[in-house]
Amino acid sequence: MVSQTPEAEFRVTYKGEIPSVHLPVRLSVLEAVAFKTTCQQIFSGTTIPSEIILDFNQTTFIDSSGIGALVSNMKVARQKGSNLVLRRVNPQVMAVFALTSLDQVLTIEQPAPNANSTETHHSKDHQLPITHPSVRSWVKRLIDIVGALVGLGITGILFLPIAIAITIDNPGPIFFGQTRCGWMGKHFRIWKFRSMCVNAEALKSQIKNQASGAIFKNDNDPRITRVGRIMRKTSLDELPQFWNVLKGEMSLVGTRPPTPDEVERYEVPQWQRLDVKPGMTGEWQVNGRSSVRDFEDVIRLDLKYQQNWSLMYDLKLIFKTIAVLFNKNSGAV
């Protein structure tokens, strides 16, 4: 017997004790919040179902907020001993799952009718959602490529003296790689010149966080080397990120690239900042990056960038960044 619960945020039907949540055509921030609320209502019941069916038959658009709600619900389901089963997922949504590697961890029952893996593979780039105009701007991408090539040329010139300074000050690797979250939450490896001691990541838990929310900051972080402080003051440590820009993982201008542990603490609306590519610079960089200590301020600046974005706005932020680099009050990200 199939029954319907009218009080749910989304339409929920039951077949026996197994609920099916019917998702809407679009799964962006407002719908994503409602999606999370709907699943919370199911999980707060007296009996936790062994599985929850998520019917994606109507859904053709999902952005980073939708991904955030799905990830959040998946974690709660596992904590409750339940499982989310995705049914009738359209190729557009499957392309997003493939981009973010969620197709590796989600239980997907079956593809949408008439969708085959070969077709999806060849057209997945065209099926990815346009979460923000900057994502599909070929002019912005051209500026990124030209800027990255120029930046890598400068990096090549400065590489030897920087490498020698790093090695003399604190022997170890020249480069530091760290997993960050890019567009739609996709993981990528960001590169910098190493500005901290070799075992910096292992020592992070021992350092006091002077910021509030899902960011980490400490003005006197003891892990930073002497040469590292100079590089951070001048942003020389970030020169290798031009490689990330050239690969398309980052942009010259965008939002601050968060770490996975930061993203794990996001509420659904905060995932909106992942609707654009992360950038080497952005609003947070030109508005006193070292003085931004509240995560809500980071969100505000990132959303301001998304709302005001244009090619001229990007160029304006690039020139502002150059000015900030010569400001003695600038600081490390």
Which residue stretches match the model-derived regions?
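STAS-typified acidic loop motif
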Residues: 6-37, 56
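Short, non-transmembrane cytosolic segments of multipass membrane proteins
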Residues: 86-119
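Short, glycine-rich, amphipathic interfacial segments at transmembrane boundaries or analogous
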Residues: 176-223, 281-298
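A hydrophobic, helix-centered structural microdomain
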Residues: 134-202, 317-333
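A short, structured surface patch at a secondary-structure boundary
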Residues: 215-276, 317-325
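Short, glycine-/small-residue-enriched flexible loop/hinge segments at domain edges that mediate gating
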Residues: 40-63
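C-terminal terminal-structure detector
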Residues: 2, 273-333
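Glycine-rich flexible loop motifs, especially short His-Gly-Gly/GGXG/HXGH segments used as catalytic or interaction
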Residues: 112-149, 174, 289-311
